[in-house]
Amino acid sequence: MTLWINGDWITGQGERRRKTNPVSAEILWQGNDANAAQVAEACQVARAAFPRWARQPFAARQAIVEKFAALLEAHKAELTEVIARETGKPRWEAATEVTAMINKIAISIKAYHARTGEQKSELVDGAATLRHRPHGVLAVFGPYNFPGHLPNGHIVPALLAGNTLIFKPSELTPWTGETVIKLWERAGLPAGVLNLVQGGRETGQALSSLDDLDGLLFTGSASTGYQLHRQLSGQPEKILALEMGGNNPLIIEDVANTDAAVHLTLQSAFITAGQRCTCARRLLVKQGAQGDAFLARLVDVAGRLQPGRWDDDPQPFIGGLISAQAAQHVMEAWRQREALGGRTLLAPRKVKEGTSLLTPGIIELTGVADVPDEEVFGPLLNVWRYAHFDEAIRLANNTRFGLSCGLVSTDRAQFEQLLLEARAGIVNWNKPLTGAASTAPFGGIGASGNHRPSAWYAADYCAWPMASLESPELTLPATLSPGLDFSRREAV
């Protein structure tokens, strides 16, 4: 029984699915997808649960969410292992994901009050009050790269706001989704408030096409995000929050400390085996001896990165990709760039055929035409050389995406220029592109999203504002508008 609908664990009636570890092929989870009827049922029970949940005092909803945080803390080791085994990422990194999930609770509560909540201004003859109301029934689509943390970033603020939810994890991480939902169950969520449907494309299409949905919160690829946007076009009454990928540039302008710059680049490009939406995909390096030395050192250190199993001791910097197919896709993208005329500086290599273990790749594409503007979700870094800073900014903005951008430089004025000209929602200076704070909005422009940033701003898309002018008494104004005559006429 792998679906959770209306507080009950039930068996899916759709396609049979199993999840294996992407490195060892160990079977981790087996179950059936939700079929269209079960997806519709999840929506019906969420709709039925909505009025009571929305009318709960905020403190009551907060108490359940805080109980969930306590359960995350108590079961941190267990959830860490589930995430690591299912995604292939090392144990140390999975542990940081669970920590982020725990921290998200307090941050979301603060964001609720700062971004939404209730605000009142006294007027001479009454008050002006701003309140926020939940949308209703929302669908949450989770990704596989952070199968706990990223859905959590939608689910927690949505529940705090008073919405009821249908959660579909990535079909590549069903075990994590199920494990997290079992903690929500123990936290005491009323039946129907949060529902779990497992499945792939068919389940997702059944969910996104429901007429009775009030909105959809999505984290994933640009291609799927565009499909959802088309599917919900002509339905302005539904809230749609799209958090998509990036083809992110990192500019290396002035390298005062070569090893520090190399470390920042490794953290930007290859952490999580390159499977973060903010990962650097394009490395823009200034021409000259300093840039040459930096690239040589980068290739040297990156060439020593050996991906390993989730539980290896000592722990590796990177683990496996989500699947052997994902690793193969990275290899194909590298070969495509070589065929276009790219010069390989570090060839990616499959550590073991049939697994997702893949070493990083670096390829120079300076002067190469028709390089695809796409997000290759893995450890492949494309390099361009440039002559002057204005050219670097032009190259950085030469993408349909707009998620993250970074600069390594000792010149504050260059960073100020980048802030004015960059087309990205996250712009970092001498910090990894993959560094983002939950106390700030997270999102991008262009093909990276639809102007619904998450993290600190997630509260914004989880509730709608209601403005009121209020007075406890009805009185006639002391001064009437021109043309109004309220004088008493004597009876004839």
Swiss-Prot record:
Q: Where is the active site?
A: 243, 277
> What general EC class does the enzyme of this chain belong to?
oxidoreductase
The protein in question is named: N-succinylglutamate 5-semialdehyde dehydrogenase
In terms of SUPFAM superfamilies, this protein maps to: ALDH-like
- One Pfam family recorded for the sequence: Aldedh
Please give the organism. Salmonella enteritidis PT4 (strain P125109)
> Which UniProt keywords are listed?
Arginine metabolism, NAD, Oxidoreductase
Protein encoded by which gene = astD
Keyword hit for Ribonucleoprotein: no
The organism's lineage? Answer: Bacteria, Pseudomonadati, Pseudomonadota, Gammaproteobacteria, Enterobacterales
Gene3D superfamilies in the cross-refs:
Aldehyde Dehydrogenase, Chain A, domain 1, Aldehyde Dehydrogenase, Chain A, domain 2
